[in-house]
């Protein structure tokens, strides 16, 4: 550290500080103060770097699961679908299909058992969007799947992820277990009449569409 920071070299000219619990006392500019970062409105990535991944109590302290609580006790499944439609939320794949419209296709189905499938297999070479989200903010994924289940009257969710990707697998499995331990998954979620289960399903080296 001293070798690179004590001299006016290219290393120091291109170094930035970031906020953390163990940050060094340095005079480097804070990376969050740069226009390309400070002018961002982070939504899907709002918790990245701000909470310990998989720590449910930090997540809750950062308003995590508050939308789920509101949906379960203040909204009907139909109202949740309409809220998602009105939000303009779209899929993050190539088609950018409206999420609320997709949910509305499943909601009226009267099947006794319905599943919410979450494809984090990410078989494209070099792709890391899904795995990155699992590693940094797994509880937001859990919350979104439960909301999906409530809105579509579904009973269970499977999270597909390729075997061998140990860090994201461990992160989402820990988050799911924490959700079960704290009444956010399983029977009568948060004391409501809605029950929902979730598990990870490991895939082989293949492409899941």
Residues of each region from the PLM?
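Feature of Fe-S/electron-transfer and energy-metabolism proteins
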Residues: 1-209
